[in-house]
Amino acid sequence: MDPEVSLMLLCPPGGLSQEQVSVELSPAHDRRPLPEGDKTITAIWETRLQAQPWIFDAPKFRLHSATLASSSPEPQLLLHLGLTSYRDFLGTNWSSSASWLRQQGATDWGDKQAYLADPLGVGAALVTADDFLVFLRRSQQVAEAPGLVDVPGGHPEPQALCSGSIPQHEDLPGELVVRELFSSVLQEVCDEVNLPLHTLSQPLLLGIACNETSAGRASAEFYVQCSLTSEEVRNYYLSGGPEANESTGIIFVETQRVQRLQETEMWAQLCPSAKGAILLYNRHPPLQSGAGKSHLSHPSVPALSLQL
């Protein structure tokens, strides 16, 4: 296993649909206050703001743990989520004391992630109609992994479920959180690759990977099938999109080559989130044989409706 990434959860072969995932959102799953208080988080944030005044804080979902039950008639996954923020991420996972915080969390709570923000990300193993996986070269201007190769992705947003107010646990029903989780990965594909929503399948959750370069921050990785060919996808990408500034180029890799991608020079160019997505994708042979194409959605499916 690559030291930059670890696998927290592998879903059953073929992945899980939205209907097979549920969420328990509770303050019990939030980050623990730091042993000496959160003043260091505030100081780190203020320093970062001085250097990069364009950044802004935003609430995020925090992944505490996940429970997979192999029940009949089909497996069910329960995600235990709390709330956190981008500010707390910079002050914990991304801070110079992250390793110490993990050690202290293990000592104090029996959980090395207890003091870390751990905002949950999403990523897409996006496969074209002619069987290519889609990658993006990240811009040098982005905060994380500038210049490296990534899969389309981002974060589910608590704010999307309660616009105009600060999200509170009791205001976020589990069913809506699950919908935001699955729809957010489609939103990221639409925004970053500039693809029409109706060309994308319903996402299938492959598993959860952890970025060890940011102290184990987790990302839910999905399989998404596109009804367009790689050339058509390239043309849409080159015509620009809402987040075109986040990447500088698009890369296509044949799905049959992805199994051995770790043995190629390209692997060293992948950021940890992309490595996690590929490691999980490679553990789902049914999807590599084309079974996922049966999940192509219709644009009228309510669960996939997005505000573009």
From Swiss-Prot:
Binding site residues for substrate: 56, 86, 138, 143, 150, 155, 157, 273
Superkingdom of source: Eukaryota
Catalyzed reaction equations: UDP-sugar + H2O = UMP + alpha-D-aldose 1-phosphate
A Gene Ontology term for the protein's cellular component: nucleoplasm
Chain positions of motif Nudix box: 174-195
Summary of the function given for this chain in its UniProt record: Hydrolyzes UDP-glucose to glucose 1-phosphate and UMP and UDP-galactose to galactose 1-phosphate and UMP. Preferred substrate is UDP-glucose.
Name of the protein in question: Uridine diphosphate glucose pyrophosphatase NUDT22
Gene source species: Rattus norvegicus
Lineage: Eukaryota, Metazoa, Chordata, Craniata, Vertebrata
Chain's gene name: Nudt22
